[in-house]
Amino acid sequence: MKVETAMRLLHATREQLHGKPTREVVPFEVAEMAGIDPYQREYDESVRYLLDKGYIEPYPKPSHWFYRMTNKGLEEILSG
């Protein structure tokens, strides 16, 4: 897994934040827009990287594809 791939996925979630009062993101829905097949290991590894590095966190109400953008994640997408 390349760090660049994970960061493309993170930046692709930016659209999902517009007009929402929450920081809920669903990377699975925007993976293809980032050039990542959401059914491949590369996607899973990218999400794991974003979780491990603190860019996203599991959504408080457990769900398979829902995550919450952290402050670190917001700073990254707003700076790039």
Task: Write out the residue ranges for each language-model feature.
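Short, amphipathic alpha-helical interaction segments positioned at domain boundaries
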Residues: N71-G80
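Short amphipathic alpha-helical interaction segments
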Residues: I36-D52
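Short alpha-helical segments that sit at the start of domains
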Residues: M1-P21
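Short acidic, hydrophobic short linear motifs in intrinsically disordered regions
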Residues: G19-A34
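Alpha-helix N-cap and coil->helix boundary residues
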Residues: V25, E42-E45, R68
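Minor-groove-contacting beta-hairpin "wing" of winged helix-turn-helix DNA-binding domains
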Residues: S63-M69
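A short, conserved structural fragment
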Residues: L51-K61
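N-terminal positioning helix adjacent to the helix-turn-helix/winged-helix DNA-binding module
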Residues: M1-T5, E42, W65
